Amino acid sequence: MVMRIIGLYGHANCGKSATLNILKELLRCAGNSISTVPHPNSDTPETFEYKGLIVSVAPGGDTRAIVESNCRYFKLKNCDVAISATRTRWGSAEALNEFAESEGVKVDWVPKSYEYNLSEATKTLCNKETAEYLLRKL
């Protein structure tokens, strides 16, 4: 099976990591974490079995070095679907594109924007909605 790569991109503090941590929790509930040490609510990647797929989620993605580390993790886990946060700056998106190219695929980019002047509860709902959207894409 060819690896699918999904990149959640946006500027700093727009909720990318929070969204992917919600996705990790959704996958934990609907599937099965196969990481030796689960990492809820952190930038540490985690791998799940979901609907017969191996899905790796990496909430960290602020720099090229972090995304390159995520990509090594994806390769090590031999996942069917790799999901990483990336920034719009600092080379992280380029690193994910380069990894996708090395795998012979293209990144499925999903934008994440920050809505100013929203309550924390509303921001959390927006992050949850994006996480549910990502889950449906699997």
Task: Identify the role of each PLM range.
Residues 27, 31, 100:
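Active-site catalytic pocket residues across diverse enzymes, especially alpha/beta-hydrolases
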Residues 22-23, 71-72, 96-99:
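Short, glycine/charged-enriched secondary-structure capping and boundary segments
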Residues 16, 59-67, 123-130:
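Phosphate/oxyanion-binding active-site loops and adjacent basic polyanion-contact surfaces
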